Curated annotation (Swiss-Prot):
Encoding gene, per UniProt annotation: pepB
Catalytic activity, as annotated: Release of an N-terminal amino acid, Xaa, from a peptide or arylamide. Xaa is preferably Glu or Asp but may be other amino acids, including Leu, Met, His, Cys and Gln
PANTHER family for this protein: LEUCINE AMINOPEPTIDASE-RELATED, PEPTIDASE B
PROSITE patterns reported for this sequence: CYTOSOL_AP (PS00631)
Protein species of origin: Pectobacterium carotovorum subsp. carotovorum (strain PC1)
Family: Belongs to the peptidase M17 family.
Cofactor note: Binds 2 manganese ions per subunit.
GO-annotated molecular function: manganese ion binding; metalloaminopeptidase activity
Residues annotated as binding Mn(2+) 2: 201, 206, 224, 285
Function as written in the Swiss-Prot or TrEMBL entry: Probably plays an important role in intracellular peptide degradation.
HAMAP family: Aminopeptidase_M17
Catalytic activity, EC: 3.4.11.23
Protein name (Swiss-Prot/TrEMBL): Peptidase B
Oligomer and partners: Homohexamer.
Length: 436
């Protein structure tokens, strides 16, 4: 420990009255004490208090701390890091002693969840569709290279292989659209059944296309690949925790730009599964690229298909940035995810998805419209319903996550500005606890 290191300790006792009646942080000669405000150093309330206190400590410009005293188990240590970490500058934490298993888990989270946060925070100039795909491959090879094989398809090859949605959305950019199809197969058996397919939206920048976003909505659109990054991290963390089932990952990566070659309103996309889609809003592009990945996933006949995307503003309007929205016709799968979310202390909330939502996308010229009719305003539900048309067995084993909690445009009590990494641990837990 250096002279510049601040000690951080935990206490169930209230702060001295001079710090204020509801103070959760006090200072002495050695450093800071976090007062969790409960009789236990564990539990959801304590974790939230620790994370908020860590955010305050970082706000003081303190860049080197040591977690000292009792109570610094894995959960509390991770809560501290979640709040302490910021998008710029270096921070050093001297961790308390943990068991070998907990130390490995902490190090895996630091590598993988921080990779997710760093990747989402990258400016679009530094992260195009192909870079996103190769970064995902690099992470997964670093974790479990012997179990990984992959294929990258890009540009005109997408059109020739009938990935119509991804090619249509991405063709307006100088940076080619890319589909990453990655196979995690730790069994060593090339004929092993696929347990799960993960399909991620990887829009590395979203202008809205000709349905152009205003600057106030476009300024955070480097984060529109948050679903792809989250699923990559989830598979990597599950692999690091010992996942022995075969999982395939599909990342649908593109820019959504305005150019002479960009797609237009009224265009009709013809998908490999026979569906035709009329484009009536080029800013509803995420569902168009995900459709290609979902068709591929369905062809694998997996037990589960899970897609993750920063898909709609409607989900964010309903839940803010505090929860990921989840949609499914499969109650058992929803219950399994909610149990995993509870175990990992991550926020998910189910929103409605019913059979009637599937009929809210009428078109006079195609099978589907890429946005709901004006009379049907449940934007997040109809977006999920659109995706269901590209899942072969959509009523069982399919889960859609509209990941509203991936990114924050400004700092709040518990989070710095930028990516949060929320959802990675829950999805890793789900893959592990339900793989048979």
């Amino acid at each position: 420990m250096t002279n510049n290191t601040m000690l951080i300790s935990l206490s169930t006792q209230p702060a001295d009255a001079r710090w204020g009646e509801k103070a959760t942080l006090s200072v002495n000669e050695q450093g800071f004490t976090i007062h969790v405000g409960t009789t236990s150093l564990n539990g959801k309330a304590a974790l939230a208090t620790i994370q908020r206190a860590a955010r305050k400590i970082d706000g003081q410009g303190i860049k080197h701390v040591k977690l000292a005293g009792e109570g610094w188990d894995l959960a509390n240590s991770w809560a501290f890091w979640q709040g302490y970490r910021g998008p710029k500058g270096q921070r050093t934490v001297e961790w308390a002693d943990l068991s070998d298993a907990d130390k490995k888990e902490l190090n895996d989270r630091l590598k993988i969840v921080d990779w997710v946060r760093d990747t989402i925070n990258l400016p679009a100039e530094d992260l195009g569709p192909e870079q996103l795909a190769t970064r995902a491959v690099d992470l997964l090879c670093d974790v479990a290279c012997d179990a990984i094989s992959y294929r990258i398809t890009k540009g005109e090859d997408l059109r020739e292989q009938n990935y119509a949605g991804l090619h249509t959305v991405g063709r307006g950019s100088e940076r080619q659209p890319v589909l990453l199809a990655l196979d995690y197969n730790p069994t060593g058996n090339a004929d092993a059944p696929v347990f799960a397919c993960l399909v991620g939206k990887g829009i590395t920048f979203d202008t809205g296309g000709y349905s152009l976003k205003p600057s106030s909505s476009m300024d955070s659109m480097k984060s529109d690949m948050g679903g792809a990054a989250t699923l990559t991290g989830a598979l990597a963390l599950a692999a690091s925790r010992g996942l022995q089932q075969r999982v395939k990952l599909y990342l649908c990566c593109a820019d959504n730009m305005v150019s002479g070659n960009a797609f237009r309103l009224g265009d009709i996309i013809r998908y490999r599964n026979g569906k035709t889609v009329e484009v009536m809003n080029t800013d509803a592009e995420g569902r168009l690229v995900l459709a290609d990945g979902l068709i591929d996933a369905s062809e694998q006949n997996p037990q589960w298909i899970i897609d993750c995307a920063t898909l709609t503003g409607a989900a964010k309007m309903a839940l803010g940035n505090d929860y990921h929205a989840l949609f499914s016709f499969d109650d058992e799968l929803v219950a399994a995810l909610q149990e995993s979310a509870k175990e990992e202390n991550e926020p998910f909330w189910r929103l409605p998805l019913e059979e009637f939502h599937r009929s809210h996308l009428p078109s006079s010229f195609a099978d589907l419209n890429n946005i709901a009719s004006g009379a049907n305003t449940a934007g997040a539900s109809t977006a999920a319903a659109f995706l269901s048309h590209f899942v072969k067995n959509y009523q069982q084993g399919w889960l859609h996550i509209d990941c509203s909690a991936t990114y924050r445009k400004s700092a709040v009590e518990q989070w710095a500005t930028g990516a949060t990494g929320l959802g990675v641990r829950t999805l890793a837990n789900l893959l592990l606890s339900n793989a048979k």
